Amino acid sequence: MRKPPRRTRERILETSLALMNREGEPHVTTADIADEMNISPGNLYYHFRNKDDIIGELYDAYERTVAPLLATPPAAEVEDLWFLLHLLFERMHEYRFLYRDLDEITSRNRKLAVRVADLLRRLESTVLELSRSLVRNGRMRASERPRLLAADRPPDVRACR
């Protein structure tokens, strides 16, 4: 039985993700993506108006993979926290260009900058709540003030300032 062919739009997203992770978002153009896929730039533009639209869809996909992890109930064991952190870091690695090129991407797209800042706050909140749960259950010890100094301010996303 033959596999059904992947749709062009999905292939554009997969190729874009791979290129941006490998080369860095600022170094990838829509022409590079089309060349990598052996399609015409017009075919790419049929599916996406510009590179920022592609980035927006990639961010949507990233957010969908992370959202269920943020809804995780408080951990009962330290291993649960480590597992959650492992899953979060796997997702971050899969979409690593978003973090590596965060300033560049968010400086061009205010709406995305706001969404990124919100997600970073939710990530921080989830990890802090899981840590507090472990402290309450006696599974982990923490100082009076378990937050990192860097966590005392909102995520540093230039476009949100």
PLM regions: where:
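Helix-turn-helix
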Residues: 11, 15, 19-53, 57
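N-terminal intrinsically disordered/low-complexity leader segments
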Residues: 1-7
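Short, hydrophobic secondary-structure boundary micro-motifs
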Residues: 100-102, 115, 142-144
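Short, basic, alpha-helical segments at the C-terminal edge of helix-turn-helix-like DNA-binding modules
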Residues: 60-66
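Short helix-capping/turn signature of helix-turn-helix
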Residues: 48, 104-108
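Hydrophobic alpha-helical connector segments
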Residues: 57, 70-98, 107, 112-114, ...
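Amphipathic alpha-helical packing segments from all-alpha helical-bundle domains
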Residues: 111-137, 147-161
